[in-house]
Amino acid sequence: MALVRGGWLWRQSSILRRWKRNWFALWLDGTLGYYHDETAQDEEDRVVIHFNVRDIKVGQECQDVQPPEGRSRDGLLTVNLREGSRLHLCAETRDDAIAWKTALMEANSTPAPAGATVPPRSRRVCPKVRCTSLSWKPCKVERRIWVRVYSPYQDYYEVVPPNAHEATYVRSYYGPPYGPGVTHVIVREDPCYSSGAPLAMGMLAGAATGAALGSLMWSPCWF
């Protein structure tokens, strides 16, 4: 892309209203870019000039802006764009400001040549962002049943969990296995789960407790 005009200009920021010195390049396609230096490699921004300029004020016509410190008001330029924004610039001399005004007005009215391409906006490398997606999987909940059984020998309720085979072993005696007065209840859960399974287990546990209590109540009558 051919360069129409290039040079150093002061530019006022739109937010903080601070002046900064940049290298400006007016390209043949009707765009005005400003860079950190004259190599025009690291571009800060670019403004469309072609058919986008309403008017340009120079020098003392720029009443609503103050020049940079140590610079004359004669070098000021205010470019009013059709989109509503303004570009406040300041050249080294009044002649330089007038030359920039002439070049910008010609770029505004001159049609872009056929085959004109826009130069690269910037060669700054942006960090790459790596996106990852996580798939949702349902949680597996292991079903366990806990049974409370009254122990007549210890006089308290014990909670007995099931083993790995879904079988609950309730033993009301903690002495030697198969000793006198021992009650063994084995409760096996039906592989097909139903809402009545906890009730059935409760009934069996209650029957075992009742049998143990009954044997204790009638045991004095045998002596």
From Swiss-Prot:
* SUPFAM superfamilies xref list: PH domain-like (SSF50729)
User: In what residue span(s) does the PH domain sit?
Assistant: 2-109
Query: Which compartments does it reside in?
Result: Membrane; Cytoplasm
Name the domain of life: Eukaryota
Would I find Chloroplast among this entry's keywords?
A: no
Give the keywords, sorted.
Cytoplasm, Developmental protein, Membrane
Q: Looking at the UniProt record for this protein, which Gene Ontology cellular component terms does it annotate, in alphabetical order?
A: cytoplasm; membrane
Q: InterPro entries, from UniProt?
A: PH-like_dom_sf, PH_domain, PLEKHB1/2
Tissue distribution is: Highly expressed in photoreceptor cells, oligodendrocytes and throughout the myelinated parts of the central nervous system. Detected in brain, liver, kidney, spleen and trachea.
Q: Does the keyword Aminoacyl-tRNA synthetase apply?
A: no
One Pfam short name:
PH
What do we know about how this protein assembles, alone or with others?
Homodimer. Interacts (via PH domain) with MYO1C. Interacts (via PH domain) with MYO7A. Binds transducins.
- Indicate what this protein is called per its UniProt record: Pleckstrin homology domain-containing family B member 1
